[in-house]
């Protein structure tokens, strides 16, 4: 699939229409405009950041990195936090992700393991993971980070 080529995804046209700004390619001004609209929201920041209809492409892992880099808490209401550095953190993490994937891609070509790399990358993206169920308000520690579940 080439960037911008949605033909293989024609089954998902209705879902694609409802996606927000693409985090990986969205302009800083677009991202800033969206984040500015959250300023008075009483929703938790993590919920807005992971809402694919607002900004698409940010999952739990990248969302965690973005919030950590910005020094923001996912469990607090958006209106109770200073979001001034959020977009810069989004762009910083985005560039870091692109750089790492490019590096891994180039290494795989040099080592003649392109097929293996693509298969591992695809499996990581779509791997079926077991999920634990936690009660609302419970706390989960993962790799030194605390997650408050709502």
Regions found by a protein language model. Name each.
Residues 1-72, 80-88, 143, 149:
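Phosphate/anion-contacting hairpin/loop surfaces
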Residues 95-150:
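C-terminal accessory segment of soluble enzyme catalytic cores
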Residues 77-100:
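Charge-dense polyanion-binding interfaces
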Residues 41-45, 56, 93-104:
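Short secondary-structure junctions and interdomain/linker hinges
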């Amino acid at each position: 699939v080439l960037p911008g080529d949605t033909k293989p995804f024609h089954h998902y046209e209705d879902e694609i229409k409802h996606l927000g700004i693409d985090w990986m390619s969205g302009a800083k001004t677009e991202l800033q405009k969206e984040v500015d609209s959250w300023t008075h929201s009483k929703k938790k920041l993590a919920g807005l950041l992971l809402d694919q209809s607002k900004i698409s492409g940010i999952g739990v892992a990248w969302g965690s990195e973005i919030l950590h880099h910005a020094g923001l808490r996912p469990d607090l209401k958006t209106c109770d936090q200073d979001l001034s550095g959020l977009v810069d953190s989004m762009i910083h993490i985005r560039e870091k992700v692109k750089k790492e994937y490019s590096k891994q891609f180039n290494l795989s070509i040099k080592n003649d393991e392109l097929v293996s790399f693509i298969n591992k990358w695809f499996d990581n993206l779509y791997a079926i993971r077991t999920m634990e169920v936690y009660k609302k308000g419970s706390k989960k520690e993962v790799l030194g980070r605390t997650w408050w579940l709502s």
